Structures are given as C-alpha cells and as structure tokens.
C-alpha cells in the first residue's frame, strides 16, 4: 500500500540547458515584497481590523509589532481603515475606495478577519468576503504563503498521533489570482434539454506559473531545500503546463530538490507522513484545500499566519482563521495567528528579519511559560484570554536580548 501511494512522486533533475523562456520568468523574484528596503526604518502600515474577533487580535498584534520594531530601531505609522462587514455598515460597500488608496500607499497591510452572521443574507456583491477578494486584486498579490508548523509545546493538540505530527514544519505556497476561481467562461446556464448547468474554467498562462514557481523555489531555498509541486497532470491540461514550467525552472535552482505529486496523493500524504514535506507549491484551488488540511495538523487554526505577496507594492498579511462572531468581544480569541502574521509582515513584507525573530521567539516563550487560550488549552496549562495572551507575548518581546538572524 505504501509503495503504491508513492508511485506518482518523482524527483526531477533538469539539464542545465533547458530553461523557461518567458520574459517574466527571466526576472528573479525575491521572497519579499518590492517595498522592502533594508535601509528604511520608518514604515506605514495599513490596519484592516474587519469583523468579529478581527479588531481584538489586530489591536494586540499592532502593540507587539510596534514594540518589536522599536527595539530594533524601526518606526511605524499605522492607519486603520474599514473593510468587510464593518465597511458595509459604515459606507454600504465591503471595500471603500479610501481603504484601497490607503492600502496601496502603505508599505504593508495587516488584516484581521472578515464576515459574520449579520451579513449572511446580503447579495453576493454586498457580502463582506467580497472585500477580501477586492483588496487582493487591488494589491495584485499572487503568492500566498501558509506555514504549518507543529510547535513542541502544542504537539498533543494535533489531530494526528504524536509520532506523526511531531516535527512537522512545512510551507504551502499557493497561487492566488489564477485558475478556476477566476477563469472564464464561468456561469450557470440552461442547456438544450432545459436543465441548468454550472461551469467554471481552469486557466493558467505560462508567466503565472513561472512567477509562483520562483517564489516557491526561493522559499524552499531559504528553508530546507526541498520543493514538492502538486498538480493533476495525469488528467488536466492546465496541470500538464504547470508541471512543464515548474520543471523548466528547476535548473536555475540546483540547490533545491524538486519533486512532483498528484493532488489526490498529496492530500493522503499530508495525513500519512507530513514530515516528508518542506515547501509545497500548487495552484489556486488545490492550494486552498491543501493549506486548510495542513493547518489542522497543527491543532488549531488560531496559531497560523499567512502572507500574500505581489511583484511590487505592499503585501497582505492575515491570520487564516475566520471572524468567529460567536466569541467576538468575549476575550476568548487566540491572537497568536495575527501576532505571527505581523512577524511575517516584518520578514517578508519589510525585510526586518531581526524584529520578526523577536516576535516569533516571544510567542514561543509565552507558550513555554504555559499560557494558553481556550482553543489550545490542555490540563496543566494556564487558561488565559485574548488580552492576557497578548500581554504575555509583549512581555516576552521586552525581556529578550537583541535578536540574532
């Protein structure tokens, strides 16, 4: 059985003379937004608290971000703008033009959460979630980075056995703006038999594949040097092109070991043996599914950050969890995913790796000291609310000696 599961995994060694040829693929992509400048020490950050628990966790992350930055000589100018349901209530649209302008003019954007029961019956164009799609489009972010790390302090919170979950540390790099979610034609029509038919189109151009592949190769290079490209090349033409382009780029990254895996196998392998993965790159819909699957290995989506990057301009950083309207305003939310999103903002958005390391280390210290919000609580640890968890992380940022990279 195990052997059968591995049959569609293939390590690729590409001749040095075979390279992708699109103009876009010839430009190097650094895993950091173009606004990042190592010499710059003052940044404008647009905060989008959004709905539900969003304002609570963003407020805490802002304080941690500001403190970590100040210890490394970094200053921030914060601008808070409405999005989602909050914007609907305020001005009648999920993403006001003023919010778009502020986001574009900033160095990075930190988002809380979007949505809630209150707006569930709105028309499609007036749903809070529309604001998220619109801000992604406005910022032209195309690469979504989703880490899934099982921390030693939380290994027992995983849904998998300890021996399977322990040591998992992977990154899913998801293409964010192409594929079946955006392809045309799409719609619902009535066929010649009078039956309704729904249809969508999976479309990828070579340059779209090349640019996400470059982000993935660069990410893998900075991690453990292993990249697994996930597709469905045995069935889908779009995946055949995907595999071809990713393979072609491999020769430019001889220090990265490339393998390919079909998406159905990848879904099984993430549960069977997640430690085999370092960096995964895949298309929009596969990445949407696999990154959620990977997140559950960690035990709580309240721990997981994400980064969405563009070729140029500000990146969008947000926790992967939803707005959790059922616990909003009750001091029950886990702020760690948003705090870690702030760390990703520093690392990938601004290039401030020392300040980012301070935040990452502070989260570990708070967990080592036994503090837990309800979603990660277990016997023998101290149950705390959202605010107290934030305060503990803030104390840990303060107590650290200068961070090293």
UniProtKB/Swiss-Prot annotation:
Pathway terms, separated by semicolons: Amino-acid biosynthesis; L-leucine biosynthesis; L-leucine from 3-methyl-2-oxobutanoate: step 3/4
Phenotype caused by lack of the gene: No discernible vegetative or reproductive phenotypes except a slight reduction of both male and female transmission efficiency, but decreased leucine biosynthetic enzyme activities and lower free leucine concentrations. The double mutant ipmdh2 ipmdh3 is lethal in male gametophytes (small aborted pollen grains abnormal in cellular structure, and arrested in germination) and had reduced transmission through female gametophytes (slow embryo sacs development).
Sites marked Important for catalysis: 181, 232
Entry keyword Hydrolase: no
Details of cofactor binding: Binds 1 Mg(2+) or Mn(2+) ion per subunit.
EC number(s) recorded for this UniProt protein: 1.1.1.85
Tissue expression remark: Expressed at low levels in seedlings, cotyledons, hypocotyls, flowers, roots, pollen, leaves and stems.
Protein source organism: Arabidopsis thaliana (Mouse-ear cress)
Outcome, altering residue 235 to A: Reduced activity toward 3-isopropylmalate
Modified residues (Phosphoserine): 70
Subcellular location field: Plastid, Chloroplast stroma
Job description of the protein: Involved in leucine biosynthesis; catalyzes the oxidative decarboxylation step in leucine biosynthesis (primary metabolism). Catalyzes the oxidation of 3-carboxy-2-hydroxy-4-methylpentanoate (3-isopropylmalate, 3-IPM) to 3-carboxy-4-methyl-2-oxopentanoate. The product decarboxylates to 4-methyl-2 oxopentanoate. Required during pollen development and involved in embryo sac development.
One Pfam match: Iso_dh
Upper taxonomic lineage: Eukaryota, Viridiplantae, Streptophyta, Embryophyta, Tracheophyta
Stated name of the protein: 3-isopropylmalate dehydrogenase 2, chloroplastic
Originating gene: IMDH2
Binding site for Mg(2+): 264, 288, 292
Effect of mutating residue 132 to A: Reduced activity toward 3-isopropylmalate
